[in-house]
């Protein structure tokens, strides 16, 4: 697993394939993605997800605080970058001016495997209205936001698969009390601060939906996965949606749902 994330080009290629096979079809269940649409990804990394949208004729803008990852993205998308089909900015999203730095508003905003790392998630989710195109008519319904994330209570919701020790094989270990978890991490020479930060920011299905409602959004589409679609490339397991009876049980569903997709829009 660690090797998978360390090989950035392979990870980029997998993100492209996953977005083309799962993310874009999920969005297109509700809106058609047409050439010329503007797509903003917050926390874009190497921009593999954005590449899938560019392949459909969209313009992509990637926001990423980790500048070296943007340099990798520029390398992997050299042709698209040179042609102006994608641009990047390395800046705190709260300091970004939509008109001056992003070139205007967007049809689609993407946060994939990002929201579970964000402090003050209500603030960010509310703030994104500043970058969405407004609804003008039935034919111009306004922008949407896509989220993909692992619920905190799922077997590896603490991202402990990134550990270098035996802890990477232990499901739900991240749910131990903080003091015990910290001791285990330090005992096994892991980066305790990094994994404990995820413990602070992890988000459940119910909390995410509650935040969206309080911030003035409505849910356009959602999919809960028993097997995360990305597992198709990691392990050879095809993405599989959660069974209805589990999906219908609040809180309990978090423990057995490895990934959720949501599409939201302003009410």
Task: Give names to the regions the model predicted.
Residues 111-112:
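A short beta-strand submotif of the Rossmann-like class I SAM-dependent methyltransferase core
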